[in-house]
């Protein structure tokens, strides 16, 4: 509390400015994406391994979604979708589950970033890293820890040809 930071008053509090900002985002983007730690790897370590790859859907990171949200968007189990907001867009494979609340979707963090066009600043991530969609800001000026791994998004069926996953390809070397 002695640092004088508005966001660190020294006791639990309700941040109405942040709540108002979140309400504005929710009005534009109807689905709340929660990104948790993965069960098949340690953060992003071993994403290239067989255990992690076995969890992918058509090579993409899985996204869990309530069937009613999927039905409203013409999305089916096992299909690939585009998940997007103002910060970017990713591809993900869909699992449907009644255990996910309507209006909420869940993905694990740690899929290796695989931009469709590495030269483009907001290129589509074809592998499914939710960090593309979350805000890049610390939790406070005091701690600079990770902010909550959640954001507001919309989801649409991917109807184009799927681009190949290249995140696991070895680097290209130039011989001199």
Identify the meaning behind each predicted range.
Residues 1-50:
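Long, low-complexity segments enriched in small/aliphatic residues
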Residues 44, 48-64, 68-176:
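Long, contiguous, secondary-structure-rich segments that constitute the structural scaffold
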């Amino acid at each position: 509390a002695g640092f004088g930071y508005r966001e660190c008053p020294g006791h639990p509090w309700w941040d109405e400015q942040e709540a108002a900002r979140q309400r504005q985002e929710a009005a534009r983007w109807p689905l709340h994406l929660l990104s948790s730690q993965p069960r098949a790897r340690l953060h992003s370590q071993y994403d290239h391994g067989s255990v992690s790859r076995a969890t992918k859907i058509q090579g993409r990171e899985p996204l869990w979604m309530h069937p009613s949200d999927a039905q409203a968007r013409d999305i089916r189990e096992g299909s690939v979708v585009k998940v997007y907001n103002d910060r970017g867009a990713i591809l993900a494979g869909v699992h449907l589950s009644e255990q996910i609340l309507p209006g909420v979707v869940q993905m694990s963090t740690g899929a290796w970033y695989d931009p469709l066009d590495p030269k483009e600043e907001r290129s589509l991530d074809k592998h499914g890293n939710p960090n593309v969609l979350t805000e890049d800001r610390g939790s406070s000026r005091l701690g600079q820890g990770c902010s909550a791994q959640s954001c507001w998004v919309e989801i649409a069926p991917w109807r184009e040809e799927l681009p190949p996953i290249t995140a696991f390809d070895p680097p290209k070397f130039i011989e001199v």
